[in-house]
Amino acid sequence: MIITIAFASCKKGDTGPAGPNGATGATGNANVQSLTFNIDSTQWVADSAGLQWGATYTLPAATNVSGGVFLYVQDDNNWAALPHVDYGITLEFNYDPATKIVEVQSADARASVMIPNPPSMTFKVVIIPPAIARQNPNVNMGNYREVKAAFNLSN
């Protein structure tokens, strides 16, 4: 009954002028994806000679895989782009868009030296569509802070 009275008390009249435009919002990043994942020390598998270790991570099914794939490893409080060399140990990665599998490899730069099992590590993957990357040609993709700022990444 109260609703009926509220609608009945409204009068049809002329439409007023449009209000002012709102402020311009921040540049979005809807098409740039970023996620963090861990590889535990128990997930690393050595090759038969013990010269190289590998581990895999499968991206979530909802991940859009078109574009550039950039991988960073947490190094103290910073993110270092792969490939990355630390104390003679090289970290590099391969990405297969068909399976959405990121494979991380760790090996001694001298290629003939056995290395110990890598520790647990935290990685960040950033996927940037080609059109978005072309709009930002001066971004140093090897510098995560620059990537984060340019593409408005929250993490």
Residue ranges and their predicted role:
Residues 39-118, 155:
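Extracellular attachment/recognition segments
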Residues 1-4:
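Sec-dependent N-terminal signal peptides
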Residues 6-9:
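C-terminal motif of bacterial Sec signal peptides marking the signal peptidase cleavage site
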Residues 119-155:
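C-terminal partner/receptor-binding element of secreted or periplasmic proteins
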Residues 29-42, 134-138:
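Disulfide-bonded cysteine-rich modules in secreted/extracellular proteins
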